[in-house]
């Protein structure tokens, strides 16, 4: 974006998703549902902590609501055009969408925004990645979920 206020908004949203969303939602879900299965017990591996998963899933709802509000008030999360903020949010969402942990039915605006972002050619290589032994959710590769 050209205007300083628009650049600030992009950076604010990038920090929101890369720090807050990661700490409260995507980080714990990926750690508990994926990383732990490949880690030694002495390194923190083992059975997933269901209380952590439950809390992170609740936090996803809160963040999804915020994404929906942004998507209803703007074309993209930080303004009229896609920015790094959209990519940051979509990257975190794609990780938990892979696991099937995004309640898309709870916010149509967030769902429509994510469908637009993941339909972009630059995002498609991300959707082609698969993890052996962990099948992707139905919505992960479906562009019109």
Model-derived segments and spans:
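Short, structured secondary-structure boundary patches
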Residues: 44, 126-127
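GST-like fold's C-terminal all-alpha helical module
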Residues: 17-118
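Acidic/histidine-enriched, glycine/proline-rich intrinsically disordered or flexible terminal extensions
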Residues: 130-145
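Short coil/turn segments at secondary-structure boundaries
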Residues: 2, 26-30, 128-130
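Alpha-helical scaffolds flanking conserved acidic
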Residues: 3-13, 87
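Intrinsically disordered, low-complexity segments enriched in polar/charged small residues
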Residues: 16-17, 143
């Amino acid at each position: 974006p050209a205007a300083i206020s628009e650049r600030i908004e992009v950076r604010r949203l990038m920090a929101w998703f890369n720090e807050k969303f990661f700490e409260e939602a995507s980080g714990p879900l990926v750690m508990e549902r994926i990383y732990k299965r490949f880690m030694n017990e002495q390194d923190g591996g083992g059975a997933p902590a269901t209380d952590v998963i439950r809390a992170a899933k609740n936090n996803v709802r809160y963040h999804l609501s915020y994404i929906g509000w942004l998507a209803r008030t703007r074309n993209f999360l930080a303004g009229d055009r896609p920015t790094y903020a959209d990519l940051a949010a979509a990257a975190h969402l794609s990780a938990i969408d892979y696991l099937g942990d995004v309640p898309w039915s709870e916010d149509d605006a967030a769902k429509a925004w994510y469908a637009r972002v993941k339909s972009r050619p630059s995002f498609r290589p991300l959707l082609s990645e698969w993890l052996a032994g962990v099948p992707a959710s139905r919505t992960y590769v479906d562009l019109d979920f």
